[in-house]
Amino acid sequence: MMAREYKTQMEAARKGIVTPEIEKVAAKERMTVEELMPLVACGKVAIPANVNHKCLEPEGVGSMLRTKINVNLGVSRDCKDYDVEMQKVMSAIDLGAEAIMDLSSHGNTQPFRQKLTRECPAMIGTVPVYDSVIHYQRDLDTLTAKDFIDVVRLHAQDG
């Protein structure tokens, strides 16, 4: 497989490369690729499309686009059942949600995050600062910038 000539949708748009994600978002938004590309190129529209999120149905967020439905969920000390959270994810998708925000703040969050990016077609957001505290099992004020960046990198690698 040939290497892509871009890392982000913004970079692709700036280079004049029409990606499959840009084409899909333009169709969903009932606009032409020519209308969408400048908005992506200048940052007025973002198309979150991590290459490790294999089942992603791309969506655009930003200026001149329709409002998206986001659902917040995740495990906590009080509710630790990842299967229940996945049921919530699938219900949200069935009801039309385009984005899922994983606010998990307890336990080993990586398997759940990986399951999300394997099975959930919606855009996925996470909160690396929550996971930094969990991952290192330390208070937030003791974490270094490197600790935080390492967790951000881990989240990106998970999709």
Where are these predicted regions, by residue range?
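Alpha/beta enzyme core
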Residues: 3-4, 8-159
